[in-house]
Amino acid sequence: MLLLNYTQNFQLITFLLFPFINTFDYNCLKPTTTTTTSPTSSKLGFLNRSKSNSNININELKNKFLEQQQEGSISNIAGVATTQQNPSIVINSSSSSSSSSSHHPHHQKTPSNSSSNFNLIKASFNQIGVAFNNNISPRSNRKEKEKDKDKDHQDNSNINNINNINNNINNNINNNNNNNNNNNNNNNMHNPTSSSPSINNNLKGKNVASIIAANGANLNNSLSNLHQHVNNNSNNNLTNSFNSVSHNNISISSGGSALSYNYTQQLNQNGGSNNGSTSNSTSNSANNSLLSLASSINGNIGSDENGSNVMYGGDIASSYHSMSIDPLKSSTNTETIEIMVVGDELSNKARFISSFLNNGIGEDPTLEISTKKSIAIQSGAYNVNINTTVGQEEFWGINDVYYRSSQGFIFVYNVNSRESFLSFLKFRDKIIHEKGTENILMAMVGLTSPLINQESGEESCIREVTQQEAKRMADLYSCSFVELNSFGLDCEHQIQSIVTDLLGRITSGLSSTNNNNSGNNSNNNNGNSNGNSSNNNSNNNSTNNLNNSAILNESIAQSIEVLMLGDIFVGKTQIIQRLLGNPFQNAYKETTEWNRNVYQMTVNDVRYLLKIVDTCGLDIEETLNRERLVSTQGFIFVYSIASRESFLMIEQLRKKLSSIKSETKIPSVLIANKGDSLIRQVTFDEGSKMAQHLGSHYFEVSSMFSDDESIGRPFEQLLIDIQKSGNASGFEPSEIKKKGYLFKEGKKLKSMSKYFFKASRGNLSYCKNESNKSKVKSIQLSEQIQLAIPHNVHEKKDVWPFSIILDPVSKHSINLIASTEEERNAWIKAIKFNCFLEDITSNIIDDVVKSMVSEIASGVAGSGSNNGNNNGHLKRSDTTQQLNNSGSFINGINANKPVPNFSNLSISGGGSSNNSNNSTPMSSPYGSSNNFSSHLSQSTSSMSMSPQQQLQSVLLSSSNLSSSMNSSFSYSSSISSSYTDSMSGSPPDSNGQVFPQSPQLKKTLFQRTTSFSKGSKLK
């Protein structure tokens, strides 16, 4: 086997057949050639071989050769072919064991007077030692022989890849020849192509280093011919600069990556300005061929016991154009992508990274790992830098740096540990917090290998996370998902695919962003040259962007966070697991910390991502604080029908929530669990009354026997309640005005009296009886007034107190009590609205008056363009738009509620003009159109008028103003007919003017606008 494995060249065979011969005549090694001069016979001397050195003494062989060259006689060495065009080495792999010279290939006879050929042969000697070292390295270890069998299949694929690269380069040259012939019919050019011989399959069993050394000449030939072809045709078709692959380098190291096929691109400035696409396509094809070679060779050199790539025999570097490059250095155009692997201590993150990098980290990982590996994908070659912090999960300052700098994340967990799986949301929240965005690219990897108990050493194969649950979690957060049996070398290909897929998602996002930016820049450039056409394109692009964003918003689900509250042992976790589709677990496992679970649900054609927070029942009241509940939108109270203590704890939890949450109405449901229990301590009626007291819906289920529909019904009802509370966008007319009976606390403590209250028009009035309003007391509501719910008062049955704080400094307040919680919420909502009603009305009036002035200004422009036309019409679209935009002040009340729609307002009015020059009735909403147009035309034509005269050109009818104010409050007039009575005009005075009756309104109007008496005439 040793002889069969090392039959690379004849010199090696003779060396093995005669190991004890001290002298050897090398005349038989001279090739048979036909020359004019007779060949000179010479001896190269002795070949020394010691036990400590199994390689041929190349230095001694080289010295013999140099001595003969000085004498004028040169002999070629068997197994080495040198040509003038390509001085690379071709190792003859087809040598037989026979000593006959006819079995050897013929070599070129080099003249003794050729110094250039001598330099070529001398340069070839520098590579003989490396080539022989790889060919005759002894493999005495049986394990290495077994590994050689496994490498046969990989070496065959590498041989085919190298052949394909040569064929691709030759095809690219032929394509260029065809293009040149089509463009230059009169010029028949001879395009040099490389006839790359096929690689001998007898190299099977050798490492990739020997394959590259044996076939490097073919690749160099192809690349040099391609370079020469580009230079010859630079003046015809190849106009742009050609990225020639003139320095292709092959280097092997035993450290990080196994084999890096690095090449540097040189820009050759070529003339011409015709067709440059051919040059670019040829260069890209050559680059892609080299990238495919790098990806095919990478990782197939060999590996030691730890999985790291090693060399057999030494390093190889091709000497073409004095090539040498550091394998750790990459091209300047290669981009680095940061990827971080996250997970808890049970996920075996270090082994995952070790299998991907194949660098021998193994079972002894460092505390901080930062390793790069080059990956070639369709979009190009990238340096993937994988980071993780094994053992530093508690040091958030270190992890934050990795979170912010990483572009993609890989979450690994163990399927036999639910705690390991639930840490996904914890890590994702931290990443979102650090990066400031929810647009995160992640991959989820599940490890199915058994857990090993560190104390007992026993393996645990009890699966706690189903594949369906993990797949659902991955789909909700747009993560790729895969499960692996192990993170060893047997799954290296799958791990490589996971990282490659994530890299493709990252680079596609970056390329789409760059394409959008370049597209916008190109549209702008085209706009400068093409004019209107570019504007149309930009409008179309903006329309498409709006449509895409609308589709994206529709596809994005709303996120709702729900909190499960209840005593210990009531079954909160089992209800969540049944909702997620997992079976009931008989074994009890206490929940020691708050865990998040995500469930997707569609209610009323709206898709929700329900984030269900499972709380620990032990000391739940102490763990509830404002920071934990700030993002919670709904609550689920759970108690056990077999435990009255858990039932009584619901009231304590409700009071705790009421003291923390500022909302008066908190969406919640009440679930009575363990309905299958024979020991019942809480009846169904008691649970129903508790739910009525909470203002919630009541459900009684069994986490063991209830079906999936019964388990999911409480969550669906909670989402409906959240929808209702969220859809209360803006105050309805029935909520603005509120009247009814409330109990008011008297001067004496605990002295409650029943009064009739009415909240409307920014006032809160109350009296003893609704029919007798002789003694009515009123409170002016303003934004300084606050409302609060006293939580320190012991609430009795049908008692729902709340306080109106009139003076926060002196703490003067009025304590009121409603009969039901819904009644109390309605009163609080109505009082809040009326507290801000004064600001609302002033802002409405401000916007209405500004809109009227803008309409007058538009009428000025219209009358000026009509040259005195008396039939000018005023635009109302601007008024409607501004009124729709007005009311943003309501956001101060509730930022989540949209403003009322005033699009149905109609500002109109009538009146007569007292001008003696024109007694025609007014057809314009703001006065006589004839007189109005004439004054406006004069104001636009005469620019020498004083500012006072220019202001007097605006004739604002107070009667029309009052009527427009009445119409602007049509939204409020639907509440009560008396609401707009105060806004109606008083009887006209001697001048026929009508002013609003409200002093505050009149003051606001005259502060913000300038109105003058009608009939004034410009001089």
Curated annotation (Swiss-Prot):
Pfam families: PH, Ras. Residues 141-155 have a biased composition (Basic and acidic residues). GO terms for molecular function: GDP binding; GTP binding; GTPase activity. One of its GO terms (cellular component) is Ras guanyl-nucleotide exchange factor complex. Residues 93-102, 158-202, 860-872, 977-986 have a biased composition (Low complexity). Component of the Sca1 complex composed of at least gefA, gefH, scaA, phr, and the protein phosphatase 2A subunits pppA and pho2B. Interacts directly with gefH. This is Sca1 complex protein phr. It comes from Dictyostelium discoideum. The gene is phr.
